[in-house]
Amino acid sequence: MAPPLSPGSRVLIGLIRVYQRLISPLLGPHCRFTPTCSSYGIEALRRFGVIKGSWLTVKRVLKCHPLHPGGDDPVPPGPFDTREH
């Protein structure tokens, strides 16, 4: 079971949701990764909290450019992730 979300994580997830609903449809699908960078950001914030989740999200967004091949890039397992790998 994941820990409850901090207020900071909730705010950042809310901002990402605004981007997904209002800005992303205007830009069209162009993320080179699976999951998309915004979905990755939400999952990273949920798994790791505001500090590490934000850092992982920033690193991911900085990789999303035409010179990077993209592809499958899931969020790393979190401390409360009980799935076997």
UniProtKB/Swiss-Prot annotation:
Membrane topology field: Peripheral membrane protein
Compartment annotation: Cell inner membrane
Keywords (A to Z) from UniProt: Cell inner membrane, Cell membrane, Membrane
Record-level GO cellular component terms: plasma membrane
Stored InterPro entries: Membr_insert_effic_factor_YidD
Task of the protein: Could be involved in insertion of integral membrane proteins into the membrane.
UniProt similarity note: Belongs to the UPF0161 family.
HAMAP family, alphabetized: UPF0161_YidD
Official protein name in the record: Putative membrane protein insertion efficiency factor
Organism: Enterobacter sp. (strain 638)
